[in-house]
UniProtKB/Swiss-Prot annotation:
Entry protein name: Uncharacterized protein YyaL
InterPro entries per the UniProt record, alphabetical: 6-hairpin_glycosidase_sf, 6hp_glycosidase-like_sf, Ssp411, Ssp411-like_TRX, Thioredoxin-like_sf
SUPFAM superfamilies: Six-hairpin glycosidases, Thioredoxin-like
Family membership: To C.elegans B0495.5.
One GO process term, biological-process aspect: carbohydrate metabolic process
Organism annotation: Bacillus subtilis (strain 168)
Disulfide bonds: none
Length: 689
């Protein structure tokens, strides 16, 4: 057990991850000047240990090493030890993760990097056991070796550190050239298609991540090209994930990733960002296919978020841990005996048939409910049930099992509020509200955006994190770009011009704080931020899309709807700046490539003026909101003069005969305005572009 008698400095922090280490015998510092001043004064190397509160292997290393007196003595005597919550300081995490990947060929968390007192790295790794095992060096040996090397061969350490720092500087140098062309659009699809798992959906081999932004790209590629495999790859993946154990069939919501190819055994932690992005992906897939199962999944994700990841103030938690009482997945798995005891023999046996529950289990002797191999039609026939009767029985069973599960010890909740991840959920809720015409989803999104505006924007500066009354760290490009995405989706769900105005103000601030005036692209950190050893520009789309990728898409959206060509020109500059990265690995930049698709493919600019109470206006807006038209922009107001500040090009338009009037422009040519709403709907909805 951890030493509870003498807390270290982390006891004064608000981060759930740092607080998990506040009673370690290690003399931890939070990231800051105090730690580096001590390292310089005492001429000691620095351990920067980075993780997050719901990270399984972070827990393992904490228990094996950071709660261990021998390790603590080594660290306290020979090093300065710094703990970093990667979700609060993604800038620090990003810099040193790149170093770990450079030095070891891999990355992940916990991330443990040894640096000089001037923050230059000379050794890096992820999980270290206390003593050597799993083909990994023991942490005791690593600490002994590095402290001796730092003391006795300082010149060698400094050479390694200097070379590593120089590599980072070179990697972030600006690149110029011609912009991305249509061929990049097709290469992105080809690379995604070549990695597609034709049996179980998804991309690549286990561990398999949902990667919803790849699915969003494929939906847009299908829309713009009609390539039938693109849509199949999306639906196959979404269907497989919804059937798999990665989806919680009792409490809803998706886990972070699958440890196997068929989506059966998840890494059980649930992240806000995954569920936010998957909410968007399933909603868009519903727009394209009208598959009611996708709508059902969206409803269930939102139910889960409301029940388990929402503060009373309307903001959203960050994550739920995978572990309970030291066991991964313990909260979520079942024995067959537990199922039968809860449901009784008849309903229990039926549930076990449907959800793959057996005596031997499918995960370490227990069962993860799933529908991967379920023969539903055969089960209905054998039981003499209609689809409706079966569904009602299974819903009854689910509710009973959820009630039983809630009596178990609940996983640790990381309840900090992150601006960037909250913005992703706001965008997902707003899109769901728009497509499903569901006001309560919009209400949830509005509650969360109000919280951000009231608590996480200080003197006009967007901040990173709120927890327990404390706001911390100046926002990064992700915070601004994701929040811009949220505002634009809120606007499209409500056509409230105030959201468009807020989006424009936020964009101006984003450009002022992050834009590289010399070479183009957005830096990860603001011009007013703490200086690290390198100032990065990130464009790779990992589990979460990069700030530059999201910014490029939103610049085009905002530029198109407001007529501000300078925003479109900035996106074009980004096509040039990031071209070498994207051409080297197109599928790794699938969200960024959405912006290229939008920019190069045919699109319409739609302007609608009319009274908010006019049934004709309501009709055309509802039809446009439900349709999947990813390239088009829609500007809506009651009167043209309302647009004079935000979209001045439309201020001189007029309303014809007091009726709702629709203006449609396409490929730099505008049609005559019309008040024939049925005709306008046909024109706008029937075409692919």
């Amino acid at each position: 057990m951890p030493n509870k008698s003498k807390p270290n400095r982390l006891i004064n922090e608000k981060s759930p991850y740092l607080l998990q280490h506040a009673h370690n015998p290690v003399d931890w510092f939070p990231w800051g000047e105090e730690a580096f001043e001590k390292a310089k004064r005492e001429n000691k190397p620095v351990l920067v240990s980075i993780g997050y509160s719901t990270c399984h292997w972070c827990h393992v290393m904490a228990h094996e090493s950071f709660e261990d007196e021998e390790i603590a003595r080594l660290l306290n005597e020979r090093f300065v030890a710094i703990k970093v919550d990667r979700e609060e300081r993604p800038d620090v995490d990003s810099v040193y993760m790149r170093i770990c990947q450079l030095m070891t060929g891999q990355g992940g968390w916990p991330l443990n990097v040894f640096i000089t007192p001037d923050q230059k790295p000379f050794y890096a790794g992820t999980y270290f056991p206390k003593t050597s095992k799993f083909n990994r060096p023991g942490f005791v040996d690593v600490l002994e070796h590095l402290s001796e090397t730092f003391a006795n061969d300082r010149e060698h350490v400094e050479d390694i550190a200097e070379n590593a720092a120089k590599h980072l500087q070179t990697k972030t140098a600006a690149k110029t050239g011609e912009g991305l062309s249509e061929s990049a659009i097709h290469r992105t699809f080809q690379q995604l298609a070549s990695g597609f798992d034709t049996i179980y959906g998804g991309f690549g081999q286990a561990p398999k991540f949902p990667m919803p932004h790849m699915l969003m790209y494929l939906l847009r590629y299908d829309h713009n090209t009609g390539q039938e495999n693109a849509l199949y790859n999306v639906t196959k993946t979404l269907d497989s994930m919804a059937n798999g154990g990665i989806y919680d069939h009792i409490g809803y919501g998706f886990a972070r990733y699958s440890t196997d190819d068929e989506w059966l055994v998840p890494h059980f932690e649930k992240m806000l960002y995954d569920n936010a992005l998957l909410l968007t992906a399933y909603t868009e897939a519903y727009q394209v296919t009208q598959n009611s199962r996708y709508k059902e999944i969206c409803e269930q994700i939102i139910t889960f978020i409301q029940r388990e990841m929402t503060h009373e103030d309307g903001s959203f938690f960050s994550a739920l841990d995978a572990d309970t009482e030291g066991e991964e997945g313990k909260y979520y798995v079942w024995s067959k005996e537990e199922i039968l005891k809860t449901l009784g023999d008849d309903l229990g046996t039926l549930y076990c048939q449907v959800y793959d529950i057996t005596e031997e289990g499918n995960f370490e002797g227990k069962n993860i409910p799933n529908l991967i191999h379920t023969k539903r039609e055969q089960i209905k026939e054998d039981a003499g049930l209609t689809e409706k009767e079966l569904s009602l029985k299974l819903e009854d069973a689910r509710q009973q099992l959820l009630k039983t599960r809630e009596e178990r010890t609940y996983p640790h909740v990381d309840d900090k509020v992150l601006t960037s991840w909250n913005a992703l959920m706001i965008a997902g809720l707003a899109k769901a509200a728009k497509v499903y015409q569901e006001p309560k989803y919009l209400s949830l999104a509005k509650d969360a955006i109000t919280f951000i505006e009231n608590k996480l924007i200080i003197d006009g500066r967007v901040m990173v994190r709120y927890r327990d009354g404390e706001v911390k760290n100046k926002g990064f490009i992700d915070d601004y770009a994701f929040l811009l995405w949220a505002y634009l989706d809120l606007y499209e769900a409500s056509f409230d011009l105030s959201y468009l105005q807020k989006a424009k103000k936020l964009t101006d601030d984003m450009i002022s704080l992050f834009w590289d005036e010399e070479h183009g692209g957005f830096y990860f950190t603001g011009h007013d931020a703490e200086a690290l050893i390198v100032r990065e520009k990130e464009v790779y789309d990992g589990a979460v899309p990069s700030g530059n990728s999201v910014a490029a898409v939103q610049l085009l959206r905002l530029g198109q709807v407001t007529g501000d060509l300078s925003l479109i020109e900035k996106a074009e500059t980004m096509f040039s700046v990031f071209k070498p990265d994207i051409e080297a690995y197109p599928s790794g930049h699938a969200f960024f490539m959405q912006s290229v698709l939008r920019h190069l493919m045919p699109k319409k600019e739609i302007v609608i003026f009319g009274s908010a109470d006019d049934p004709a206006r309501k009709q055309i807006i509802a039809e446009l909101q439900k349709a999947f038209k990813p390239n088009d922009s829609i500007l809506v107001a009651e009167q043209p003069e309302q647009c004079k500040d935000i979209a001045p090009f439309a201020a001189d338009y007029r309303i014809i005969d007091g009726k709702t009037t629709v203006y449609i422009c396409e490929n730099f040519a505008c049609q005559q305005p019309t008040t024939n709403i049925e005709e306008a709907i046909h024109t706008l909805i029937s075409s692919r572009d």
